[in-house]
Amino acid sequence: MLQGSSQHSGRDAESQALRHLQQHGLRLLAQNWLCKRGELDLVMLDGDTVVFVEVRYRKHTQWGGALGSIDGRKRQKLILAAQLFLQSESRWSSHPCRFDVVAIDGASGAEARLNWLRNAFDS
């Protein structure tokens, strides 16, 4: 039950992040893109730039919050997955790329705080 609730909250956070990014003019290229190196939550297009978006949700911030949950190992997995995406979707391989994080902290709904961090880390 807890796992289902956690997965549901994650999907809700992804939907909220997607809406927020689309309201700011980004266009969805892929969602929950899976490969042998992991998963890309959202792949968006911002003008001519391919944006790999990691969505993190934490109900409580006592252990560092959503942003604090992205460590070096997670960043490396995202970079490898992004490389595989660009190899498999060659039409985007010549475009500039960046890694963004959408961090959502707090209970879901109106009380949750969404923080969109552009260029969160370099590859």
UniProtKB/Swiss-Prot annotation:
Disulfide pattern: none
Classification via InterPro entries: Restrct_endonuc-II-like (IPR011335), tRNA_endonuc-like_dom_sf (IPR011856), UPF0102_YraN-like (IPR003509)
Gene3D superfamilies: 3.40.1350.10
Example GO molecular function: nucleic acid binding
Family: Belongs to the UPF0102 family.
Protein known as: UPF0102 protein PFL_5073
UniProt source species: Pseudomonas fluorescens (strain ATCC BAA-477 / NRRL B-23932 / Pf-5)
